[in-house]
Amino acid sequence: MGKRVAIIGAGVSGLASIRSCLEEGLEPTCFERSEDIGGLWKFSEHAEEGRASIYQSVFTNSSKEMMCFPDFPYPDDFPNFMHNSKLQEYITVFSKEKNLLKYIQFKTLVCSVNKRPDFSVSGQWDITTERDGKRESATFDAVLICSGHHVYPNLPEESFPGLKLFKGKCFHSREYKEPGIFKGKRVLVIGLGNSGCDIATELSHTAEQVIISSRSGSWVMSRVWDDGYPWDMMFITRFETFLKNSLPTIISDWWYMKQMNARFKHENYGLMPLNGTLRKEPVFNDELPACILCGTVSIKPNVKAFTETSAIFEDGTVFEAIDCVIFATGYNYAYPFLDESIIKSKNNEITLFKGIFPPKLEKPTMAVIGFVQSLGATIPTTDLQARWAVQVIKGTCTLPSVTDMMNDIDKKREGKLKWFGTSETVQTDYISYMDELASFIGAKPNIPWLFLTDPKLAVEVFFGPCSPYQFRLVGPGKWPGARNAILTQWDRTLKPMKTRAVGNPQKPCMLCHLVKLFVLPVLFIAVFLALI
């Protein structure tokens, strides 16, 4: 084996990192503080300190063809959007098939990660771990941090005057597990993210009244998109990205808002974002609009102040006799085992080159995997991040100078503020980011060449969903089954829905979809030109 690599965390990022190390002949050792793999997706009856926590009813927001490991498709009969237990089943099968479990030390807490005295020459790290009360130290050639960012809850109590006076229950959404104990209660959920909306709509079936308080609003998308197909297989395409980047900003913004409002007018539901043209990550919830229509969930602005039993909103209205306040206010980014001078985290801004590498290390032997967020699935993103990180650790790929990396970070930060706003500085565009990472290791598909040599595949790659298999067509880790997986991805999408024979399942009409995408912006341009 080659260099020794420490991997912190055995969620999907950690598993991708173990596999990438093995593919490139490195020696991985993964430290996992719990007794099982899965990280965020491993449900527990109680929230555990230092570990991500989910509620019992969590389903994926990405469909199975878009969120698999790129050389390991889900079984045909798996549903397109999975319950957390189903995804955990897939993760377990993957880890066993790839023989990853033997590289994981369970129930092991990483206490500290420090540079060795000769780090500027060796690039090595001293890592102290603890298991069953016993501490041990070991030296590693590199470290991959895969501990996630849904661990340390953000509870902005100072932003809500009077909260300490409130006599009802008050807790972060990570503590929420199931709705039974809220029967007949009056509940205020603060935050309009995925967790806040999921919890609110679930509670609406048992609670007396549920209100969501939102500071800035949000786009709300459905998992069910055009003609009933999974949203991401229709929305996340290279062609759509090409249009977005090619059209004038005014046209691109208009088209984006039209897509977001296709299901319902957000203004009518009190959900409209303050700046609707920002590409902030939308909320995925199939129930919320219906709950608002039925009156079981109401949307209110930010809370101005609390009293002993009530919440006063910024519009002057009051929600009285509150039994419980649930803060779905996200998480803070922290690495308690690491000197903060290596990875700085302040005001949601972190200093990482491409969201992965600390730029000022003398040796590029540390990487953060799975930190970046995008309107795309986590698993393929972490897989590609890990593949590049391992190539850098091996020395096969090199990083730019510190100056160039810092300039890139500053440039990307400006772009992110423009597209996503101040609260989403870890967010990025999915396809652009994936292509950038893939180009570093020679895994980016050559679209023009594909049109010349394999037009059938090229059409699916460019106009169809940008599925993970595309990034295993070429380069290190190339998968011989990638081409067939791309050409059969719609078959696997339709298979679990074929539970009653009513004719042949229909794949999407790509031509009709493309016409819809292309013609409307053209018509808008024509009308715009006619009016000036």
Curated annotation (Swiss-Prot):
<comment type="similarity">
    <text>Belongs to the FMO family.</text>
</comment>
<keyword id="KW-0285">Flavoprotein</keyword>
<feature type="binding site">
    <location>
        <begin position="61"/>
        <end position="62"/>
    </location>
    <ligand>
        <name>FAD</name>
    </ligand>
</feature>
<keyword id="KW-0560">Oxidoreductase</keyword>
<keyword id="KW-0472">Membrane</keyword>
<feature type="binding site">
    <location>
        <begin position="60"/>
        <end position="61"/>
    </location>
    <ligand>
        <name>NADP(+)</name>
    </ligand>
</feature>
<feature type="binding site">
    <location>
        <position position="32"/>
    </location>
    <ligand>
        <name>FAD</name>
    </ligand>
</feature>
<dbReference type="Pfam" id="PF00743">
    <property type="entry name" value="FMO-like"/>
</dbReference>
<keyword id="KW-0812">Transmembrane</keyword>
<keyword id="KW-0521">NADP</keyword>
<dbReference type="GO" id="GO:0034899">
    <property type="term" value="F:trimethylamine monooxygenase activity"/>
</dbReference>
<protein>
    <recommendedName>
        <fullName>Flavin-containing monooxygenase 3</fullName>
        <ecNumber>1.14.13.148</ecNumber>
        <ecNumber>1.14.13.32</ecNumber>
        <ecNumber>1.14.13.8</ecNumber>
    </recommendedName>
</protein>
<dbReference type="GO" id="GO:0050661">
    <property type="term" value="F:NADP binding"/>
</dbReference>
<keyword id="KW-0256">Endoplasmic reticulum</keyword>
<dbReference type="GO" id="GO:0047638">
    <property type="term" value="F:albendazole monooxygenase activity"/>
</dbReference>
<dbReference type="GO" id="GO:0004499">
    <property type="term" value="F:N,N-dimethylaniline monooxygenase activity"/>
</dbReference>
<dbReference type="InterPro" id="IPR036188">
    <property type="entry name" value="FAD/NAD-bd_sf"/>
</dbReference>
<dbReference type="GO" id="GO:0005789">
    <property type="term" value="C:endoplasmic reticulum membrane"/>
</dbReference>
<feature type="binding site">
    <location>
        <begin position="195"/>
        <end position="198"/>
    </location>
    <ligand>
        <name>NADP(+)</name>
    </ligand>
</feature>
<comment type="function">
    <text>Essential hepatic enzyme that catalyzes the oxygenation of a wide variety of nitrogen- and sulfur-containing compounds including drugs as well as dietary compounds. Plays an important role in the metabolism of trimethylamine (TMA), via the production of trimethylamine N-oxide (TMAO) metabolite. TMA is generated by the action of gut microbiota using dietary precursors such as choline, choline containing compounds, betaine or L-carnitine. By regulating TMAO concentration, FMO3 directly impacts both platelet responsiveness and rate of thrombus formation.</text>
</comment>
<feature type="binding site">
    <location>
        <begin position="40"/>
        <end position="41"/>
    </location>
    <ligand>
        <name>FAD</name>
    </ligand>
</feature>
<dbReference type="InterPro" id="IPR050346">
    <property type="entry name" value="FMO-like"/>
</dbReference>
<feature type="transmembrane region" description="Helical">
    <location>
        <begin position="512"/>
        <end position="532"/>
    </location>
</feature>
<dbReference type="InterPro" id="IPR020946">
    <property type="entry name" value="Flavin_mOase-like"/>
</dbReference>
<dbReference type="InterPro" id="IPR000960">
    <property type="entry name" value="Flavin_mOase"/>
</dbReference>
<keyword id="KW-0597">Phosphoprotein</keyword>
<feature type="modified residue" description="Phosphoserine">
    <location>
        <position position="401"/>
    </location>
</feature>
<keyword id="KW-1133">Transmembrane helix</keyword>
<keyword id="KW-0492">Microsome</keyword>
<keyword id="KW-0503">Monooxygenase</keyword>
<keyword id="KW-0274">FAD</keyword>
<dbReference type="GO" id="GO:0050660">
    <property type="term" value="F:flavin adenine dinucleotide binding"/>
</dbReference>
<dbReference type="GO" id="GO:0042412">
    <property type="term" value="P:taurine biosynthetic process"/>
</dbReference>
<feature type="binding site">
    <location>
        <begin position="9"/>
        <end position="13"/>
    </location>
    <ligand>
        <name>FAD</name>
    </ligand>
</feature>
<dbReference type="GO" id="GO:0047822">
    <property type="term" value="F:hypotaurine monooxygenase activity"/>
</dbReference>
<dbReference type="InterPro" id="IPR002255">
    <property type="entry name" value="Flavin_mOase_3"/>
</dbReference>
